């Protein structure tokens, strides 16, 4: 499994950026996570005012799958929690930033500080059976899209209540840098 995932990571093709509706892509991907028997429920909050973005739909599907699977794993391993503390994927657009933000939040235990600093490096993982390539692939695809990617622990009442990963994409009439 590790060899196959590394091969896929190493041979990731260049992104073919086209105009895409990120909200529609999120809704499409989420259909695979909508089962009543889902390990951890996944909710979505889509900003209806989001313009189209420049992206490679296939690669962005991969990003969403990696982030959603990680979020489900983390939330599940944290055990039963607060009602509604499942996984959330959302989009948000700010007019001033001229970018669309995609964020995945989980209800897990967050990342230890030493992992948080290196989370996007290959082979860094918190999972016993993880390969450590999921977030490395996310970072590589984000770079191909000229996207900023951020990862942070979510804190409430002084304790970590999960993690979040956010990517921001240029809207379609803005040339990527």
Language model: regions and residue ranges:
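A conserved beta-strand-to-alpha-helix junction within the catalytic ATP-binding
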Residues: 16-30
